[in-house]
Curated annotation (Swiss-Prot):
N-acetylserine found at: S2
Chain's role: IFN-induced antiviral protein which inhibits expression of viral messenger RNAs lacking 2'-O-methylation of the 5' cap. The ribose 2'-O-methylation would provide a molecular signature to distinguish between self and non-self mRNAs by the host during viral infection. Viruses evolved several ways to evade this restriction system such as encoding their own 2'-O-methylase for their mRNAs or by stealing host cap containing the 2'-O-methylation (cap snatching mechanism). Binds AU-rich viral RNAs, with or without 5' triphosphorylation, RNA-binding is required for antiviral activity.
Region (Disordered): 446-472
Protein name: Interferon-induced protein with tetratricopeptide repeats 2
Lineage: Eukaryota, Metazoa, Chordata, Craniata, Vertebrata
Subcellular location: Cytoplasm; Endoplasmic reticulum
Organism of provenance: Homo sapiens
A GO biological process held by the record: defense response to virus
First and last residues of every TPR repeat: 51-89, 90-135, 136-171, 172-208, 247-280, 281-335, 336-366, 367-405, 406-448
Record remark on domains: The C-terminal part folds into a super-helical structure and has an extensively positively-charged nucleotide-binding channel on its inner surface.
Similarity remark: Belongs to the IFIT family.
Gene giving rise to this polypeptide: IFIT2
Record annotation: effect of changing K255E: Significantly impairs RNA-binding
Length: 472
């Protein structure tokens, strides 16, 4: 192939609508994290969008250098499209063909690249466009793909579904996608914004039990009294009755009962989900956290005597067993090791606690995760190991992290209380005076930053330009 032809082919590739041009890895810390999120979504979306998942897995295989495996995933996607969308097979296959072209390009098989570029061109030319067309089905496919990736892709997924609905406002699939994206983006503060799309999606998809549980979760989070609270419970019960073996329904229903402070019901549902996917790290993690909630329930009851202690240790044992299975299945899971460490500390197993704290410190953590770890380890040093100086050190390290969070405020409060307690015993305590000076300096810096931000907003200097909104 001549250089001109190769350049022309590369130009055509860049115009294709597919995973290789959607920038799906943007903002990801690593390929492992990205893969983990995708597999997390894969295992629970176990009935629908199988072709979408095959395309996404093909992209992941390519990123890992497994191009032959990627091609096998794409072949499977083609088969599924023929089964699921026989009447729209050409339009629905455009993304898959684009992925084929890119994989073959990276394999150096340019003649095969040309075959798939031509297949895309043949379909697009029917709509007076060479290599890409505006199609609600393509927008929908991109939307589901971005939803599977989660995180910072949810906002873009919502835009895709909104765009698709402009052309087909009553389409059940597009409406479901918009509802799920709205649910994910409406975390805090809870508002009516996700309720209406969910209700509309359920009207158009009355057999989609997963949507019903999402609506129940949103209603519960709104904390509305009376009818809507009862409506949420009814929705979950109906979903479980009609879809008793669907893992995404089971898991989301378990979340509903956890939020209602009913850990036993949540554990029952999560264990049922484990029957279908027994080695899933996330399910074991959630079961462990439910047992941890039961630990705190027993501690709050302040049961005395041997029975209370025995019950506490039994619950800690169940929590630890499931959390260890989660850690063994996926040692990158967020917070698992620090939770394990805290549970071992409650059971007076300090060597095990120290081991898991240090394992968590060895990981690459987000700012908030680092703050939480410093808070938990500081508490361990303060209350179990009776080492106030180490506790102070970790609370200070956590507060130094430039991230607003509840954990940061808790550590500031603890430092304040420790310093005041020490000064009440010794007014010249240098460590306590140092802590108070540190907190005073920190508060002054934060106040100055807030004032600078307000001045910037008033002057308009922080308002983004039109080009920034367009991603330029």
């Amino acid at each position: 192939m001549s250089e001109n032809n190769k350049n022309s082919l590369e130009s055509s590739l860049r115009q294709l609508k597919c995973h290789f041009t959607w920038n799906l890895m943007e903002g990801e810390n690593s390929l492992d994290d990205f893969e983990d999120k995708v597999f997390y979504r894969t295992e629970f979306q176990n009935r629908e969008f199988k072709a979408t998942m095959c395309n996404l897995l093909a992209y992941l295989k390519h990123l890992k250098g497994q191009n032959e495996a990627a091609l096998e995933c794409l072949r499977k996607a083609e088969e599924l499209i023929q089964q699921e969308h026989a009447d729209q097979a050409e339009i629905r296959s455009l993304v898959t063909w684009g992925n084929y072209a890119w994989v073959y390009y990276h394999m150096g098989r340019l003649s095969d690249v040309q075959i798939y570029v031509d297949k895309v061109k043949h379909v697009c030319e029917k709509f007076s466009s060479p290599y890409r067309i505006e199609s609600p089905e393509l927008d929908c496919e991109e939307g589901w793909t971005r939803l599977k990736c989660g995180g910072n892709q949810n906002e873009r997924a919502k835009v895709c579904f909104e765009k698709a609905l402009e052309k087909k406002p009553k389409n059940p699939e597009f409406t479901s996608g918009l509802a799920i994206a709205s649910y994910r983006l409406d975390n805090w503060p809870p508002s009516q914004n996700a309720i209406d799309p969910l209700r509309q999606a359920i009207r158009l998809n009355p057999d989609n039990q997963y949507l019903k549980v999402l609506l129940a979760l949103k209603l519960h989070k709104m904390r509305e009294e009376g009818e809507e609270e009862g409506e949420g419970e009814k929705l979950v019960e109906e979903a479980l009755e009609k879809a008793p073996g669907v893992t995404d329904v089971l898991r989301s229903a378990a979340k509903f009962y956890r939020r209602k402070d009913e850990p036993d019901k949540a554990i029952e549902l999560l264990k049922k989900a484990l029957e279908y996917i027994p080695n899933n790290a996330y399910l074991h993690c959630q079961i462990g956290c439910c047992y941890r909630a039961k630990v705190f329930q027993v501690m709050n009851l302040r049961e005395n005597g041997m029975y209370g202690k025995r019950k506490l240790l039994e619950l800690i044992g169940h929590a630890v067993a499931h959390l260890k299975k989660a850690d063994e299945a996926n040692d990158n899971l967020f917070r698992v090791c620090s939770i394990l460490a805290s549970l071992h500390a409650l059971a007076d197993q300090y060597e095990d606690a120290e081991y898991y704290f240090q394992k968590e410190f060895s990981k690459e953590l987000t700012p908030v995760a680092k703050q939480l770890l410093h808070l938990r380890y500081g508490n361990f040093q303060l209350y179990q190991m009776k080492c106030e100086d180490k506790a102070i050190h970790h609370f200070i390290e956590g507060v130094k992290i430039n991230q607003k969070s509840r954990e940061k405020e808790k550590m500031k409060d603890k430092l304040q209380k420790i310093a005041k307690m020490r000064l009440s015993k010794n007014g010249a305590d240098s460590e306590a005076l140092h802590v108070l000076a540190f907190l005073q300096e920190l508060n002054e810096k934060m106040q100055q930053a807030d004032e600078d931000s307000e001045r910037g907003l008033e002057s308009g200097s922080l308002i983004p330009s039109a080009s920034s909104w367009n991603g330029e």
